[in-house]
Structures are given as structure tokens and as C-alpha cells.
Amino acid sequence: SGSTYYLGAKVGAELSMMENRFTPARFKDGYGPVGAWFLLFKAKTLNGLGENFAASDAAKKELAKYAPYGTAAITPTCLRNHLMLFEMKEGRGPIMMDTVTALAELGKTMDKKELKHLESEAWEDFLDMTCGQANLWCATNTEPEKKNSEVMPTEPYLLGSHSGCCGFWVSGPDYDWVPAAYKIKADNGKVYNRMTTVGGLFTSGDGVGCSGHKFSSGSHAEGRMVAKQMVRYAKDHADFKPELSLSKEQIVDLAYKPVRTYLANCTFSTADDINPNYIKPNGMMYRMMKATHEYGAGTATYYMTNNKNLEIVMEMLAWMREDCEKLAAGDLHELMRCWEIMHRIWTVESHLRHIQFRKETRYPGFYYQTDHMGQDDKNWFCFVNSKYDPKAGKWDVFKKDYIKLIP
């Protein structure tokens, strides 16, 4: 998804809701998903004192600060994270998934065969998605029916198809009930569903902003929709002849520049990853992660940032973009990583520019803008969009009206 955002943004496609991030709760160190334990096994999370903190009066009081979202029948994911972080900062960690009680309660209505099948489901939940979590359970002698496991929020992710809604501002379908502001007309005056603000550039799945919770099945369906619209667009522009702004030789030089940088300088040092004339993508990745974790509302600060921290991280990202000119790749895998880290830096910058622009904390538990705590629905119940001007080399960030379609 990071490459999707970069490739579209660099040619001027309008982005939307890039401040939205997904910071899921996961089993610590192994990244095992918690959804099955909450929904299928009906497990509860406990603080370090063994208390079901989410059901406490203190939790209800804390959630009331974020009404109407915090007082809804179903607590939003970000606020569930907020409660977890609240316990940890109050010194009542770690947070444990009570697998022991959950399996014991389910076992009361099952025979031995059914219970064994249930325990197998617990393991398969990890083997289906994060094998490392199953390995971790083995390595730590963890049997979920006998020993609880620690959970905590992860590092932030940017995506538009799961529990996140960042991506491109795209056209809706050409139906009467769709507001004109939600339609993008092509040069022929027609509307093509899921076309970005750049004519002929389409996206789907993670690429579509303001449209989360599609997951795999919804993204697949959206992909089919987009494919049909692309065919329709191509037929309507049968005479169009695409022209590249660079020659094929220039494109090759650009794509393989990190390899040539490496070959020209690799003899200057005995350690392959330490060199006065280049930086490896792995080193740039750690540099970006350190900057964003410490200044961009990452794990190092319990997902908190403020105006000053955002100014600092923006300066750091500008330096990183400059230094990307000296990225070096010793093989094809590193060449891929070079381009990947460039895409990540641009994507992270768009994310933080949106947080910087939105003067509120829209998603407590996912991030906190401590200079603008709490939601401000009066002024910020809207989309935040941005556009990069490739010719001027400048960003423009602005509001976009939210039009309620479903009563």
C-alpha cells in the first residue's frame, strides 16, 4: 500500500484521510491476531493485577470523555487501545489475554473431543496468519489452556482496506444519489468509478481512501469494479497514445542507480553496510523508524506527538529524502528495498502532514496530538485531503466536506 500511495501522489493524485492509521492490539512479540480470541473464544483482557479493566468504572469514566464514540454500545478499536495504554501508563501492566478462563468456560459445555478441537483452533488461528506466534508459544512453554499471554498495541500501519481508511480521493459511481462533490469527471465529461483526480489513474483496495473495512473479499470485489471501469475508460480513449517523460535509457539509469552507486563505492570500506559514500536500505529503514517512533506518534512516546515534534520529524524526513540519492543496493533484493524505503518515507510524510493539519486527536489510542487533544466535531468532522504538486515540489493540505448519505 505504501508504494501505491507514493506512485499516485508523485504524479499529483489527491490523497484523503492519510492521518488515519491502524495500530492493532496483538499478542506481544509474535504478532498473533487477537480477534478470534475476543470473538470466537470470548476471552477478556486483564491488567497486571488480574482485573478486567475494560469493564471497570474507571474505564467507563475514561470512555465518557470521548462521547458519543466512547459511550457507544461497541467500543471503537482505537478506544480499546486507549484503555490498554491507560492501564500501562498508570503502572498496571502488562495486559494479558485471559486464554485460561476463556477455554475453561467453553470447555464446560464440551466433551474431550470438542475441547481438543477448540484448542487446535487456537493454534491454527496463528498458523493461518502469524506462524511466529505459534513458535513463540512453543519456545516459552505456553499452553493457552494453562498460561495466559501478553498483548499490547503494535507499531502504526497505513492502509485503506482493513481497519484503516487512508488512500486516494477517488470518484464514486455515476448514480443520481451520489453528490456531485463525490464524482470526478474525466476529460470527456464522463464519470468513472474509482478513478483518482489524475485522469486515467485508477486504484482499489488499500488505494481507495475513506472506504475502510473492505478486507480481502471487499477489495477483490472493488478490484473487479475498477477493472471494468478501466476497460470502459480505455475504450472511450482509444486514440490516446501514452508518452513517457523519460527515455528508456533514462528509466534504466534511474531504476538501477542504487546498484551503480554500490558498485562504484563498495571497495571504500571493509564492512559492506558501512561506507562514507552510500547508505544501505536497511540503515535508512532504521533511521526512518527511529525518527517516526520518537517524533511521529510512535511506540516510543505511547503514540503521542505535538506541533514541535512534528516540525522536527518533517525536517528529518526532508534529510532522508536527500540522502536517498545515496542509497546503495548490492543485489536485486536490496534494490527492491531501496525503492521500498523511498516510498515509505514519502508515505509517512503524507501521513504526518495530515496529522499536523488536523487540529484535534481524531483517533485516541492510535495517535494523540497533545497540543490538540479530544475530537472537535464542530470544526473537524470532515475529510482531510492533500495534493503534491510534482512541478512545484510542494504539498497542499485542505479540508473536504463530509456529506452524509445514510440517515
Question: Can you describe what each PLM-predicted range is?
Answer:
Residues 1-33, 209-212, 216-229:
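Glycine-rich loop(s) and the adjacent beta-strand/alpha-helix scaffold that form part
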